[in-house]
């Protein structure tokens, strides 16, 4: 671009700052507006639907501009962050009254999708994460930072597949990776993914920086020894957070090493298919979290979301949670705790904003109310005997001195920002009170002074006044001016009057004229002092917030167990999964009719169920409810079943539903096969596998062959498997595979209409009811009638599929004919009509040659 010397002084200042932040939209403060210039203005006008103008000139060209009022900036920032944009906030830090030329300006903070902390820019019930990754194709170091809570986690992950699955689980708002990685990588498609210089991931500088941040000699205490790649990623995150926040980060107090082998692994497809926190339409209604989340605090809801997306395999922790839920259910103890927890609010994020020194007055008011509620909450916890509850109670400390300080300092309902003052209580600081009194009571002082001076001088026409040029004055008519006392100092002569000032009035003037600005400066300084006092107590306060969030989740699980009729599952060492009267926790909430509960029994002798039955019969619901019951058990929750006994699982896989991956260029069948391949490669005998309609995306024989082979493979792995299929040929697997059993969803026909009974019964289904379901769906009658004709012909003429030999005395498994299978070859029809006894040998030979030619 042109030399800066060609620009006006103000635009020179702008370009110097903009060159330091080329990738961010710059909000450049000018009076009561944030202005955007040039390409930033054009982009913002389009994204925010604001007016683009061109005013003035610089370097001989008009300047494209767009402006935003400073008092309504939060709404615009929220929209930009949601769109994945980053913004540099440039404020006036100089005094316009004393500055020659452009007022000094400085970028005071950078707002990016992964580092926002303002309440207005965040979803209060969802984590907002910043991630960094470094490594090669074999091993990756991944670091995750939640700047709004201070959680800072690291892990090392084997292979691209596991890395991408973990990123899908975490769903970070921003992802940083080295600039020297090749183009076209899968993670480049993620929102908020952008490159950083390779040296930002350097291990040595990262290690030093992290030790400095945590005030430690090394990182051994965090269990991070040997995690070179993860430490490099963590160092990059710390540097990025410092760069964007422009302040110390005292709420980042340590690292936590996460291990995949501590958790039940859920593939991305499994998380989507089970609709844990997002439904298949992308919304949040009718998800597992929408049903089981009645947490009283936003931080509790966020913790519950993390539990659902990262179930545990630690039996001791899970049983401690179960004991806590059981304890809170006794005598309905949770009912007294939940209203108290509601008074606590989102302390976790408030403390983070205090650490970042951008806490608002209302944050401190909420913290004041939370601290005031803690003693009563602690009293309520003290008699509860569950060991885990006692451990939580030990971390929920009271802070009487801080509570009293905030009670004395902050008014009951403070304004949103400190900018205009009016936050601190009268009586908190004598100097502030005096300044405010001067500012607010100047008129009364002048009236009192006028009355006193009239009485002292005996001059009834004396007036006390003020003008902007000469300030405060005492005015006397010219005829009385000679009678002015000796301490009156002449200030101004008018046509018919003289104006004076006294030492007392001069002293008042000096105070009053600067009182408002001095009061505001004093109040801001006192507010900063309050933040520093709170920052000094940040570590114990954060421990308390963590304990409060977990208490909220456990009290919520107790409430849900009572009101949704959930019961305690029992973990056992014996490999098994036994569910009595299990229910789907989401479906039962939206049904107008009672949900039909069903049993499930898998053990070391029965590892796989082949599930048959009509469409809409409930196969998918039965499979999903099993997975959700297992998942809820692995977060320490009670489950929607009369009883449940299970061993720990290592993974939950689902191959359910079908959809194209248009962005990835994959067909429905390709997506299905990719998910199937992932399951077949990674499932173990401790995995739960749900397979629904495998093979339906291709031709009948290809699909059947693939489904059959996949089922045999899973049976060989001895994974806990629910295999729903319309290929009735698969029901014979139970005869050749001892660990396989058949069940079906019951249905019946009444007056040529299908009635779904939804009961799971032993054995294969007797028929598919496909045409009855089509009729129920509204397929026209003539089409149904024609389909019946085709079905009868296909059943009469199609060759049966080969299957393993049956044992003597066992019934023939039912054959499901596929409405969309290929029609039989014409030769098959001729062969069916042929009467061999009517043919001579010569005719038979000619016919054989004819058929051979036509094949």
UniProtKB/Swiss-Prot annotation:
ATP binds at residues 613-620. SUPFAM superfamilies: DNA repair protein MutS, domain I, DNA repair protein MutS, domain II, DNA repair protein MutS, domain III, P-loop containing nucleoside triphosphate hydrolases. One of its GO terms (biological process) is mismatch repair. GO terms for cellular component: cytosol. Keywords: ATP-binding, DNA damage, DNA repair, DNA-binding, Nucleotide-binding. GO terms for molecular function: ATP binding; ATP-dependent DNA damage sensor activity; damaged DNA binding; mismatched DNA binding. It comes from the Bacteria. Transmembrane segments: none annotated. This protein is involved in the repair of mismatches in DNA. It is possible that it carries out the mismatch recognition step. This protein has a weak ATPase activity. Belongs to the DNA mismatch repair MutS family. This is DNA mismatch repair protein MutS. It comes from Azotobacter vinelandii.
């Amino acid at each position: 671009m042109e030399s800066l010397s060609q620009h006006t002084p103000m635009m020179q200042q702008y370009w110097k700052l903009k060159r330091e932040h080329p990738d961010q939209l710059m909000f450049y403060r000018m009076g009561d507006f944030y202005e955007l210039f040039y390409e930033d203005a054009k982009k913002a006008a389009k994204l925010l639907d604001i007016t683009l103008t061109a005013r003035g000139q610089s370097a001989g060209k008009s300047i494209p501009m767009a402006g935003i009022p400073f008092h309504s900036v939060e709404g615009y920032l929220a929209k930009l962050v949601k769109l994945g944009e980053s913004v540099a906030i440039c404020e006036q830090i100089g005094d316009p009254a004393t500055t020659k030329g452009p007022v000094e300006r400085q970028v005071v903070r950078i707002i990016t999708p992964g580092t926002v902390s303002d309440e207005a820019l965040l979803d209060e019930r969802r984590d907002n994460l910043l991630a960094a990754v470094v490594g090669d194709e074999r091993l990756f170091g991944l670091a995750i930072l939640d700047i709004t809570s201070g959680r800072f986690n690291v892990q090392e992950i084997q292979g691209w597949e596991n890395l991408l699955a973990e990123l899908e689980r975490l769903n970070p708002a921003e992802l940083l990776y080295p600039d020297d990685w090749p183009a076209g990588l899968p993670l480049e498609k993620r929102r908020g993914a952008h490159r950083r210089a390779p040296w930002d991931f350097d291990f040595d500088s990262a290690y030093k920086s992290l030790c400095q941040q945590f005030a430690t000699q090394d990182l051994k205490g965090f269990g991070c020894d040997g995690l070179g790649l993860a430490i490099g990623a963590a160092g990059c995150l710390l540097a990025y957070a410092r760069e964007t926040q422009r302040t110390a980060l005292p709420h980042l107090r340590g690292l936590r090493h996460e291990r995949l082998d501590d958790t039940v692994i859920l593939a991305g497809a499994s998380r989507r298919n089970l609709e844990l926190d997002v439904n298949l339409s992308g919304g949040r209604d009718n998800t597992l979290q929408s049903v089981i989340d009645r947490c009283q605090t936003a931080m509790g809801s966020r913790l519950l979301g993390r539990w659902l997306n990262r179930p545990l395999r630690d039996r001791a922790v899970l049983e401690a949670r179960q004991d806590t839920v059981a304890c809170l259910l006794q005598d309905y103890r949770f009912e007294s705790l939940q209203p108290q927890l509601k008074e606590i609010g989102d302390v976790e994020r408030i403390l983070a904003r205090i650490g970042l020194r951008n806490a608002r007055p209302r944050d401190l008011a909420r913290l004041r109310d939370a601290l005031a509620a803690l003693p009563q909450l602690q009293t309520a916890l003290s008699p509860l005997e569950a060991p885990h509850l006692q451990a939580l109670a030990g971390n929920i400390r009271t802070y009487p001195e801080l509570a009293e300080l905030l009670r004395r300092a902050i008014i009951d309902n403070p304004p949103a920002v400190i900018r205009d003052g009016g936050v601190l209580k009268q009586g908190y600081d004598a100097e502030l009170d005096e300044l405010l009194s001067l500012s607010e009571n100047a008129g009364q002082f002048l009236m009192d002074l006028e009355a006193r001076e009239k009485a002292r001088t005996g001059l009834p026409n004396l007036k006390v006044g003020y003008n902007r040029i000469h300030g405060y004055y005492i005015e006397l008519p010219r005829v009385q001016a000679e009678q002015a006392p000796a301490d009156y100092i002449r200030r101004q002569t008018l046509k018919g009057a003289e104006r004076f000032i006294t030492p007392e009035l001069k002293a008042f003037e000096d105070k009053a004229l600067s009182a408002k600005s001095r009061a505001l400066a004093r109040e801001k300084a006192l507010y900063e002092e309050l933040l520093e006092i709170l920052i000094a107590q940040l570590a114990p306060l954060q421990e308390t917030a963590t304990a409060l969030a977990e208490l909220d989740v456990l009290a919520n699980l107790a409430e849900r167990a009572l009101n949704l009729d959930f019961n305690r599952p029992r973990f056992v060492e014996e490999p098994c999964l036994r569910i009595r009267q299990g229910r789907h926790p989401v479906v039962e909430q939206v049904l107008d009719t009672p949900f039909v509960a069903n049993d499930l029994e898998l053990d070391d002798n029965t590892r796989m169920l082949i599930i048959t039955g009509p469409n809409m019969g409930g196969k998918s619901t039965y499979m999903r409810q099993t997975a959700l019951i297992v998942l809820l058990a692995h977060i320490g929750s009670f489950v929607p079943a009369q009883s449940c006994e299970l061993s720990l699982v290592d993974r939950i896989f689902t191959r359910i539903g079908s959809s194209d991956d248009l962005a990835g260029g994959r067909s429905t069948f390709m997506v299905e096969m990719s998910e199937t391949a992932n399951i077949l490669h990674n499932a173990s005998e401790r995995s739960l596998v749900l397979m629904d309609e495998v093979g339906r995306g291709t031709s009948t024989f290809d699909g059947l062959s693939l489904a059959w082979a996949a089922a045999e493979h899973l049976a060989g792995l001895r994974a806990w498997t629910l295999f729903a299929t319309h290929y009735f040929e698969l029901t014979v697997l139970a005869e050749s595979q001892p660990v396989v059993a058949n069940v079906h969803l019951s249905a019946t026909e009444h007056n040529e209409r299908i009635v779904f009974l939804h009961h799971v019964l032993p054995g294969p289904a007797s028929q598919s009811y496909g045409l009855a379901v089509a009729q129920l769906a509204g397929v026209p009658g003539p089409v149904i009638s024609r389909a019946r004709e085709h079905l009868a012909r296909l059943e009469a003429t199609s060759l049966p599929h080969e299957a393993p030999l049956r044992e003597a005395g066992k019934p023939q498994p039912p054959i499901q004919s596929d409405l969309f299978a290929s029609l039989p070859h014409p030769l098959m029809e001729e062969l069916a009509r042929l009467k061999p006894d009517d043919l001579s040998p010569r005719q038979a030979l000619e016919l054989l040659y004819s058929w051979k030619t036509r094949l």
